[in-house]
From Swiss-Prot:
Domain of life of the organism encoding this protein: Bacteria
Protein name: Hydroxyacylglutathione hydrolase
Record field: catalytic activity: an S-(2-hydroxyacyl)glutathione + H2O = a 2-hydroxy carboxylate + glutathione + H(+)
Keyword Metal-binding: yes
Entry binding sites for Zn(2+) 1: 57, 59, 115, 134
Keywords annotated in UniProt: Hydrolase, Metal-binding, Zinc
Family the UniProt entry places it in: Belongs to the metallo-beta-lactamase superfamily. Glyoxalase II family.
The encoding gene: gloB
Stored InterPro entries: Clx_II_MBL, Glyoxalase_II_hydrolase, HAGH_C, Hydroxyacylglutathione_Hdrlase, Metallo-B-lactamas, RibonucZ/Hydroxyglut_hydro
Pfam families to which the protein is assigned, alphabetical: HAGH_C, Lactamase_B
Job of this protein: Thiolesterase that catalyzes the hydrolysis of S-D-lactoyl-glutathione to form glutathione and D-lactic acid.
NCBIfam families: GSH_gloB
Binding partners and assembly: Monomer.
Species of provenance: Maricaulis maris (strain MCS10) (Caulobacter maris)
Amino acid sequence: MSELLIRQFPCLSDNYGFLIHDPDSGETATIDTPDADVILNEADQAGWSITQIWNTHHHFDHAGGNETIQALTGAKVVAPRYDRHRIPGISMEVEDGDVISLGDHKAKVFYTPGHTMGHVCYHMPMDGIAFVGDTLFALGCGRLFEGTPAEMWHSLSRLAALPDETRIYCAHEYTEANARFALSIDPDNHDLQVYAAMVEGERARGEPTVPTTIAAEKAANPFLRPDDPAIRARLGMEHDDDEEVFAEIRRRKDSF
């Protein structure tokens, strides 16, 4: 089985587009469709034909290009069953535990409500990668537009249980702002300090901070660390449960 090829590129103001390509079958999937024109151009430059669209959730900056790309390529749209009435052009509805294929490469569907109630992520264990949409960000997590803190914490906990080396492809370049907030919550964390300095350098050079890894996020992302004694002490929540601490971190980020 050939190595999966990944093409990452900026879309809109701060989204990332991702094309994944299996050389053996010639199949190509776009992860979400933030900007149809940009995605189609990237596929054309690579010499790839888009055969699948994998949607993570219904927001326009993730599914807004579905109809254009589908009309021009005939691509099959894979999307969460919960969003059957909110995402256009669905060919295959998926839910937690389903497995989809791109050639011989397999992706397991994780249902991850929180940011939205239909959100899913796509974990490709043989390739050591996961496409997580707006659930987990580098040093952050998605805003809770539809779900509860409890639902988001459960979703993040599932992602945190993936192998440490898993490369995490999140859908937005938010890391600089996330780092500033993380340092306000966990200022003495050496791993976070190193990570934040690295991010500052990458962004100064115009480089992406995505992908990240599960290991890096578990060490530095406060949204995955509500059990940390230093964070709990700073919040005055030494005796609260992880879910409550997570909810308070999210509340503070919303007004940061």
